[in-house]
């Protein structure tokens, strides 16, 4: 289940996607890849804070491998193409009240896969882009690719 280390939930749609500082994250049905991974890292809280950067690098490598697109990483949680956002990453810590220590880390990522400009709407279109827009065609959503 999701409660175990390395558990992952993947969704084709989010109804309440959110980013940092409670901002909303536009997540239309079957247009993106939305996922959450639970980790129970050993080590200090300081080391766990690096997980957001490590997640950004993992998304960067996956997108490069699958599409050939080299994204830019905006420290520490966003990936961009031509100065427009392709992916947002949110990391949250769960705390145990009794011990005052964190029990797990949940890393969520939302990747814009097949939206076009009209899908984003007038407010989001100037600042967001999908992999399909960057490629000029919708990427293959099957795994393994090819």
Where in this protein do the model-derived segments appear?
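Long, positively charged amphipathic alpha-helical accessory segments at protein N-termini or as interdomain linkers
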Residues: 45-46, 50-71, 81-146
